[in-house]
């Protein structure tokens, strides 16, 4: 005869699921674009946790899109191949040799690692880059920087077709040039452009910081676009947070409902953000 021990852990689990119900209903059939930064990928355990979160999103009716970076992995491969990098105003020049390494690492290593882990956790993921089906057509950002591109034309129909078949797109931030070039695209920029093209309900920028901070170093849990602009102007937002918040502003201006900057190294960060009252990072909305 079986017996049941209604211990506190089980009761807490049931209470958590019950509390999540309004959020499960809110995000049913929603499009959520998730940018997974190279520094947020961390260990195999962190990757497994992230993949489980993404699979769960799809299981409860969300249409997730993963856009990934890979800067640390690219740097390691360039060093291994003894390819020297030039910099202009602190930005790497992406020459022919470098863009070949970038594509090899992003599409051939990082992308497939994420795809494989999502599939191992029970999802159906497909690896793409912005070159596939002309998803992301780019113009050269600055001739001095070489093969660095800015998305100028988006074709997201392929992604919608994948949603219809419960497939999770995992996208490397590479764009197609109009003359057959391959362009390296900033990962945040690529994620923002894809989210805007899909009119996503959420753009989640997973990084290695806990969110946008005020002058006292405290994480701000919710901000309006105007506040972000003021904080950039007065220097409160500085350094690497500037391009992330600028991506957020561009995405909001182009139809994304809200953007969140959060620490992707935290276990279940995506679930905490979407399915709990207080979220997990800095939520940015339109004014």
Curated annotation (Swiss-Prot):
It is found in: Cytoplasm. Its EC number is 2.7.2.8. CDD domains: AAK_NAGK-C. Pathway: Amino-acid biosynthesis; L-arginine biosynthesis; N(2)-acetyl-L-ornithine from L-glutamate: step 2/4. One of its GO terms (biological process) is arginine biosynthetic process via ornithine. Substrate binds at residues 70-71, 92, 184. It catalyses: N-acetyl-L-glutamate + ATP = N-acetyl-L-glutamyl 5-phosphate + ADP. GO terms for cellular component: cytoplasm. GO terms for molecular function: acetylglutamate kinase activity; ATP binding. The record marks 35, 244 as: Transition state stabilizer. It is an enzyme of class 2 (transferase). InterPro entries: AceGlu_kinase-like_sf, AcgluKinase_fam, ArgB, Asp/Glu/Uridylate_kinase, Glu/AcGlu_kinase, NAGK-C. Keywords: Amino-acid biosynthesis, Arginine biosynthesis, ATP-binding, Cytoplasm, Kinase, Nucleotide-binding, Transferase. SUPFAM superfamilies: Carbamate kinase-like (SSF53633). Pfam families: AA_kinase (PF00696). Catalyzes the ATP-dependent phosphorylation of N-acetyl-L-glutamate. Belongs to the acetylglutamate kinase family. ArgB subfamily. This is Acetylglutamate kinase. The gene is argB.
């Amino acid at each position: 005869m079986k017996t049941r021990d209604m211990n506190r852990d089980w009761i807490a689990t049931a209470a958590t699921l019950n509390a999540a119900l309004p959020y499960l209903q809110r995000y049913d059939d929603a499009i959520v674009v998730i940018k997974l930064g190279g520094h947020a990928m961390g260990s195999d355990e962190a990757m497994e946790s992230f993949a489980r979160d993404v699979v769960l999103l799809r299981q409860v009716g969300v249409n997730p899109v993963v856009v990934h970076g890979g800067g640390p992995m690219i740097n390691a491969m360039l060093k291994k191949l003894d390819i020297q990098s030039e910099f202009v105003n602190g930005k790497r020049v992406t020459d022919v040799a470098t863009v070949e390494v970038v594509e090899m690492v992003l599409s051939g290593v990082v992308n497939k690692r994420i795809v494989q882990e999502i599939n191992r956790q029970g999802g159906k993921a497909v690896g793409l880059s912005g070159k596939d089906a002309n998803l992301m057509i780019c113009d050269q950002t600055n001739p001095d920087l070489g093969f660095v591109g800015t998305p100028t034309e988006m074709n997201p129909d392929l992604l919608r077709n994948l949603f219809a078949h419960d497939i999770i797109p995992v996208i490397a931030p590479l764009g197609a040039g109009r003359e057959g070039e391959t362009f390296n695209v900033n990962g945040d920029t690529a994620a923002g452009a894809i989210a805007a093209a899909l009119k996503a309900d959420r753009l989640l920028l997973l990084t290695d910081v806990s969110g946008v901070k005020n002058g006292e170093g405290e994480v701000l849990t919710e901000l309006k676009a105007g506040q972000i602009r003021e904080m950039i102007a007065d220097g409160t937002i500085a350094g690497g947070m500037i391009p992330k918040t600028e991506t957020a502003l561009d995405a909001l201006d182009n139809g994304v409902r809200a953007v969140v900057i959060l620490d992707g190294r935290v276990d279940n960060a995506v679930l905490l953000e979407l399915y709990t009252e207080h979220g997990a990072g800095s939520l940015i909305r339109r004014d």
